[in-house]
Amino acid sequence: MMKFVASEISSIMELQMRSEPISSSNRATKRTISSSSSSSSSSAGFDSYCVSLAVGPLWWSDVPQSRTDHDRASPLKEYNRKTSIDSTTTASSEFTDYDDTESTVEFMNQHEAAVIQEVLNQPTPTQISLKLFVTPQKYSVWETVFNPLDNILYVNLPSTMTHEASKHSFISLLEFAEEKLECDAVVLCIRKDRLDRPNLVRTFSFVGFQPVSPKSPLAPPHIEEQQKNDYLFMIYNIEE
């Protein structure tokens, strides 16, 4: 079911999104990673992480990771999306180039597993900035919050992104939520003042996202009560 959601949403969003170019990185062919041993906190008081997700053969493949007790088979595995960790604990990062060697791939896989496990071990909501690469030079940043209490990933849609970014980035994000965080649901946070809000609501409603009341206990914990009326919330429950 999630495969259907990803493909349908990416196709529709590719036709609907009209915006400025997304951010660029000056790295062309090298893989990058940065890390920090100290934990950082967001303005909302949550621990904060920055994770990079990349697509295509330019990036290394994941290796099977240990799963938690609520292990499930992922219907998105055939996409074979590639992932990497950009920063373990801070949103600002220093980049270091790594050669495409087997030892580097092994190190990155171990590093990724450790960071994901650290996120899953957090007892309170955790902020995750997802840097979703479309090419080695282009990416979009999606701000999310993972709530371990309800096992939900809350996603703020970027204000601007290109057709290509909207298609591939959302697929990568859904895969990350289902395969890495093993979420039970994804909640989208859509600002009411967006010009493309009607199209977004129709798109996500078509593939199974349902409205969530701002007063619902499933509403995002990271948005202040007085600001929740500025957003529309839509939830999709991930089937096991």
Curated annotation (Swiss-Prot):
SUPFAM superfamilies membership: Acyl-CoA N-acyltransferases (Nat) (SSF55729)
Biased composition (Basic and acidic residues): 69-84
A GO molecular-function annotation: ornithine decarboxylase inhibitor activity
Tissue: Preferentially expressed in adult female midguts.
Gene3D superfamilies hit by this protein: 3.40.630.60
GO cellular component, as recorded: cytoplasm; nucleus
Pfam families: ODC_AZ
Record-linked InterPro entries: Acyl_CoA_acyltransferase, ODC_AZ, ODC_AZ_sf
Region (Disordered) residue spans: 18-45, 69-95
Origin superkingdom: Eukaryota
Function: Ornithine decarboxylase (ODC) antizyme protein that negatively regulates ODC activity and intracellular polyamine biosynthesis and uptake in response to increased intracellular polyamine levels. Binds to ODC monomers, inhibiting the assembly of the functional ODC homodimer, and targets the monomers for ubiquitin-independent proteolytic destruction by the 26S proteasome.
Record-given protein name: Ornithine decarboxylase antizyme
Organism: Aedes aegypti
